[in-house]
Amino acid sequence: MRPQNNAMKIEARDYRSGLPLSISIEKGVYKKIERIPNSHDSLSFPWIAPGLVDLQINGFGGIDVNSEGLSSEQFEILCRKLFENGCTHFLATIITRPRNSYQKYLQKLNQLHCALPLNCIGFHLEGPFLSPSEGSRGVHRIEWMMKPDLSWLDEVMEASGGKVKLITIAPEIDRELSIQFIREAVALGSAVAIGHSEASWEIIQSAVIAGAKLWTHLGNALSPVVPKFQNVLLDVIASDLPYASLIPDGKHVPMVAFRALTKALGSRVILVSDAMAGAAASPGIYHLGHIEIVVDPQGKAIEKQSGRLGGSTLRPFDGVFLAHKMTGTPWWEWWDAYSVRPAEILGIPHGLKEGNEASFCLFDLSPRPFLRELYHKGKKVYCSSQ
């Protein structure tokens, strides 16, 4: 890496092809990317890949995004901990809360975001328009759930400074109103996902036509007993929904189920962590908003009261290689599922391409996957001490 003025040159191995590349970066973007011919030193080069993009971060490194007491210092710790784990872009995720609390809390998050323009690129509102059914609600509070509300949409967009980038809803709770809500949200600049839902294939298709792009953490928030042929998993697979996210921690979706779903979905899969405060932290008791979560020594995050899963402790960089381990498919395909594809949902040009923002990871694969450095908009923001 040779910095010069506001420019630098990096030599690294392309994560897809393994070929040695010379990459020139100026003013935070890739200026020139070219193959290095006949390089005898390329095996010593680090691998280079676009930074990871996580659409669902509830917390990280001991910090809860949903905490009323979230400070600017804590928010910066969370952002930098995510840098350390390969994440150059993420959505701070707000779970279901009282309707009248969204405006004030999003104003606060927007202020934090403006003061610390790091890797948080906006907000994901997971709720309050979710299914109250026992199998689908997860740890979200039923009493705070409601039908889609267009006036609420205007309020949260204004309060967030337009930074609500993803909203997860269950369209079956009011089909007609949900379709109207999806159209309006998309028009205002937010992507829409379906999740915590029992939507049928027909309703999913209607939502797709209206603009829905994603199913949020498929396989999670699902009743343990479903009809043999008419169930959410088959309906999502058979639908035209462009993407479905999966949590590759082996706890939310066991290995065999993960293999089956990813084979069926193919390139429609994206990876998310659904990380909560206990991620990149010690076992113990944490909070996800109002919910008390116990993280056990194996890293499983469980709601203390109900015993249900309450987010994950997955680190994004590890998620790529856990997905590879569970499926046996090439790791670089999972890297795309955790970087380029989620960026597409948000309309962000991402990837190793001239003119794109130079936000990337440098890492080794042997003897184990290991993140060396992370760059954000051409600036080194993390360097391993090892």
Predicted features and spans:
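C-terminal cap of metal-dependent C-N hydrolases
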Residues: G351-Q386
